[in-house]
């Protein structure tokens, strides 16, 4: 998720005038595939890596807009640095590929990319099943979130993921409904 002022993507939430404010907690040291291969070469693997193996995990770390509202830039940076440090401590600095903070979208957030090494082997599956992801969220909240006054999200929530397109459509519908209601109120007042 690297981009500069000349980035031409399809995400309409990006404000290109704010893209120059994006920053790295740590930069990628080359192309991701080269960095991954270099890291894997340091391992003593017992088996060949499967062709369908997950070579990189990516997390998006952030909170809702209300959390960042009124927060100074240095406070936001401290929050994201603390989050990155948490992941480095948990999964190993040597496995980290990059951490970039985007401030050019609706809500600031960090993209963190790393090689999923567990017990000296490439294994995203053993690191990130449903239970371990829930535990990860709790640990992150306990070690970082509490410090910033965040509340732990609902555990075992039955909420389902919707696509970005579905979310955008929902926001457009809600906005149109609000405008309609406002017009109705103004019409009733006349």
Feature locations, PLM:
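N-terminal nicking endonuclease/strand-transfer module with a His-rich metal-binding environment
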Residues: 1-190
